[in-house]
């Protein structure tokens, strides 16, 4: 169990580090976000949920469509697949040359998020939003600019 929790913690740290790569200073309010992957522990097993386009990278993953919108300190996550909506709030906890960090609360659960440009091996960049919340590591990418 400790090994799985360690792996989940490492994944969360890696997601935050990845999101801090690249240039630009995107903010959570600048985009409409789409979920790429979610990782969490069930029992002693690390479980992935993923967007349909990620199914080849995570063939064991349950396919889920989820979006996130943030504006004026309010955050809404819509789970299109399961017809659920989660609401909460966010505040800026810090800014750096690469992006912005946030404290977030969704449905009474507190966590952390960071928005920055991620640079990939081919040189392409995209705004990314990793979130760590109540044992879940969620990874969103910018679907469209507002």
Positions of PLM-derived features:
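N-terminal glycine/threonine-rich, aromatic-flanked beta-hairpin/loop signature
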Residues: 45-97
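Short, solvent-exposed coil/turn segments at beta-strand boundaries
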Residues: 28, 67-75, 117-129, 145-146
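An anionic, turn-rich surface loop/hairpin at beta-sheet edges
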Residues: 51-58, 94-120
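Hydrophobic/aromatic beta-strand elements that line small-molecule binding cavities or substrate pockets
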Residues: 65-68, 88-92, 112-121, 140-142
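Glycine-centered tight beta-turn/hairpin loop motif at sheet-sheet or coil-to-beta transitions
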Residues: 81-83, 107-112, 133-137
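N-terminal helix-cap/turn-to-beta initiation motif at the start of protein domains
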Residues: 21-37, 43
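Sec-dependent N-terminal signal peptides of Gram-positive bacterial secreted proteins and lipoproteins
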Residues: 2-23
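Edge beta-strand at a domain terminus
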Residues: 85-96, 130-146
């Amino acid at each position: 169990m400790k090994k799985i929790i360690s792996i989940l913690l490492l994944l969360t740290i890696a997601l935050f580090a990845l999101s801090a790569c690249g240039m630009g200073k995107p903010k959570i309010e600048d985009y409409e976000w789409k979920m790429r992957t979610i990782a969490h522990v069930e029992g002693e097993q690390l479980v992935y949920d993923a967007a349909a386009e990620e199914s080849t990278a995570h063939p064991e993953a349950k396919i889920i469509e989820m979006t996130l919108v943030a504006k004026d300190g309010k955050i809404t996550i819509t789970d299109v697949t399961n017809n659920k909506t989660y609401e909460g709030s966010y505040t800026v906890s810090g800014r750096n040359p690469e992006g912005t960090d946030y404290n977030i609360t969704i449905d009474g659960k507190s966590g952390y998020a960071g928005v920055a440009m991620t640079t990939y091996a081919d040189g392409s960049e995209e705004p990314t939003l990793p979130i760590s919340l109540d044992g879940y590591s969620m990874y969103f990418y910018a679907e469209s600019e507002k």
